[in-house]
UniProtKB/Swiss-Prot annotation:
Catalyzes the conversion of glucosamine-6-phosphate to glucosamine-1-phosphate. Gene3D superfamilies: Alpha-D-Glucose-1,6-Bisphosphate, subunit A, domain 3, Alpha-D-phosphohexomutase, C-terminal domain. This is Phosphoglucosamine mutase. SUPFAM superfamilies: Phosphoglucomutase, C-terminal domain, Phosphoglucomutase, first 3 domains. InterPro entries: A-D-PHexomutase_a/b/a-I (IPR005844), A-D-PHexomutase_a/b/a-I/II/III (IPR016055), A-D-PHexomutase_a/b/a-II (IPR005845), A-D-PHexomutase_a/b/a-III (IPR005846), A-D-PHexomutase_C (IPR005843), A-D-PHexomutase_C_sf (IPR036900), A-D-PHexomutase_CS (IPR016066), Alpha-D-phosphohexomutase_SF (IPR005841). Belongs to the phosphohexose mutase family.
Length: 447
């Protein structure tokens, strides 16, 4: 397989105007992807293959959308332009409209200066590695154009948001509603700025929306799932029962209760799993290396299988598919319920939590019941480039000693940062003081 140069774990991403996130590269990428899709799907039923393009609210989305559209059309692919919609909406539209692929223009939780391009398969799932490799290889081919009679056409969808709103609502039980529930919805000035408030209002909730005034530059700025403290303030000020925070492309969720307490992805995943267990058996759940130790212990107590994947929703999904499990997620709020959707979806995940609370008729804190999140201590230690920390004898000895000290009362995670020259030393333990002292022992071994 060709080594991937441009595609990371979540498509192509970078700073606007940089090596890959620019108009010229987007044109080439659209043409390369179109060539691959035409080879795979061309000639079926005598019609041209179709793809859908959705985007978030960054100012650069217009430029990248136009360039991708031109490249795809030059390769003989018809293009549906969905406009600003959440990433999971593109996955849904791709599958529902029987398209050959979906394309998302978004850098998720990053600031507006960044953007990205990622693909969904015809099944509404992340594009397989081998197809991404084919597209990478096609990027090295000369930019061309099919004959005029075979050129693709583009048109704007008029009902993309409405279709997705109805799909989200369909994942909430028909015998329940949100009448009488006061909810603050924070859409991070991102892709869900219009659809998210509509979903919860149409189910009966009294909704106050914040983060719904995108200007091309304010996406994720002090609002959304990365800044749930803004939501917590709004919930307390409004006297709301709950708050729902999404990130820029609405595939990430954090929630807040009426007291302003913030709940992360581990706690929300537990809420969903517990509700599903009230209706039947849950075979297993996939978390990540960062999933709290308390979540793992609670899964063990409930007799539910638990596996840790590498950090990244792509890896969570791979583990879920390998084991045939339906539920998985990350502490950051990427939550996947394969009995509802083919990808992580912040709005749908929130609806599953609300299902649990309406069925149980209890506040979120009470629904979490016996779940005890373990205190965490993280220390970042500078790491010189090229350092082989895995072979460091002092760190290895300290790790063994700390793990013996914890002995079922916590865990140790040591990993190099993917973005900075640092080694991250993380300890979770029953008590904050124990977590701190163990982390400091690990750090001291590297001094």
């Amino acid at each position: 397989m060709t080594q991937r140069k441009y595609f990371g774990t979540d498509g192509v991403r970078g700073e606007v105007g940089g090596e890959v996130i620019n108009a010229a590269f987007a044109l080439r990428l659209g043409y390369a992807a179109g060539r691959v899709l035409a080879r795979q799907h061309g000639g079926r039923g005598g019609s041209r293959p179709q793809v859908v393009i959705g985007k978030d609210t960054r100012i650069s989305g217009y430029m990248l959308e136009s360039a991708l559209e031109a490249g795809l059309s030059a390769a003989g692919i018809d293009v549906l332009l969905a406009g600003p919609v959440p990433t999971p909406a593109v996955a849904y539209l791709t599958r529902a409209l029987r398209l050959v692929a979906g394309i998302v223009i978004s850098a998720s939780h990053n600031p507006y200066q960044d953007n990205g391009i990622k693909f969904f398969s015809a099944q509404g799932m992340k594009l397989p590695d081998e197809v991404e490799a084919e597209i990478e290889a096609a990027l090295h081919e000369p930019l061309g154009c099919v004959g005029s009679e075979a050129l693709g056409r583009a048109r704007r969808m008029q009902d993309s948001q409405g279709r997705y709103i109805e799909f989200c609502k369909s994942t909430f039980p028909n015998d329940l509603d949100l009448n009488g529930v006061k909810i603050v919805v924070d859409a991070a000035h991102g892709a869900a700025y219009n659809v998210a408030p509509h979903v919860f209002r149409e189910l009966g909730a009294d909704v106050h929306a914040i983060g719904v005034s995108p200007d091309g530059f304010n996406i994720n700025e002090g609002v959304g799932a990365l800044h749930p403290e803004s939501l917590a303030r709004a919930v307390r000020e409004r006297g709301a029962h709950l708050g729902i925070a999404l990130d820029g492309d609405a595939d990430r969720l954090q929630m807040v209760d009426g007291d302003g307490r913030i709940y992360n992805g581990d706690e929300l995943l537990y809420a969903i799993v517990r509700e599903r267990m009230s209706r039947g058996t849950v075979a297993g759940v996939v978390g990540t290396l960062m999933t709290n130790y308390g979540f793992e212990l609670e899964m063990q107590r409930l007799g539910v299988g638990f596996e840790r994947a590498k950090v990244g929703d792509r890896y969570v999904m791979e583990q879920m598919q390998a084991r045939g499990w339906l539920y998985g997620g990350e502490s950051s709020g990427h939550l996947i319920c394969l009995d509802c959707h083919t990808t992580g979806d912040g709005i749908i995940a929130a609806l599953q939590v609300l299902t649990a609370l309406r069925r149980g008729n209890v506040p979120l804190a009470d629904w979490l019941g016996d779940l005890r999140m373990y205190p965490q201590k993280m220390i970042n230690v500078p790491l010189a480039p090229g350092t082989d920390w895995k072979s460091h004898a002092g760190l290895a000895a300290a790790t063994r000693a700390v793990e013996a000290e914890l002995a079922g009362r916590g865990r140790v995670l040591i990993r190099a940062s993917g973005t900075e020259p640092k080694l991250r030393l993380m300890v979770e333990a029953e008590e904050p003081a124990l977590a701190a002292s163990c982390a400091e022992k690990l750090a001291a071994s590297l001094a």
